[in-house]
């Protein structure tokens, strides 16, 4: 029997591929729905780097900031594609300071 984490990550990867196809075919509502589901699945594995990368990617696709500052140090150790997420954190902090 496969580990539940492996099953979740296989589902996340498959859902991400499907969302990319929907984005390419301009079916944005369906792509957004898949990205929301990816974020929910990734929330089950908050300390896993791969899940964090997929969550950040999906949040970027949804134009939502990454709000958990607890793992900002983990973000700094991720690949360069996650720099957009760091900019989203900065944007969120700036907006919060003006409130």
What are the residue ranges of the model-derived segments?
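TPR alpha-solenoid repeat register
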Residues: 14, 48-51, 85
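Canonical positions in the second alpha-helix
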Residues: 3-4, 38-41, 75
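Short coil turns that delineate tetratricopeptide repeat
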Residues: 9, 43-46, 80
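Alpha-helical solenoid repeat scaffolds, predominantly canonical TPR units
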Residues: 34-37, 71
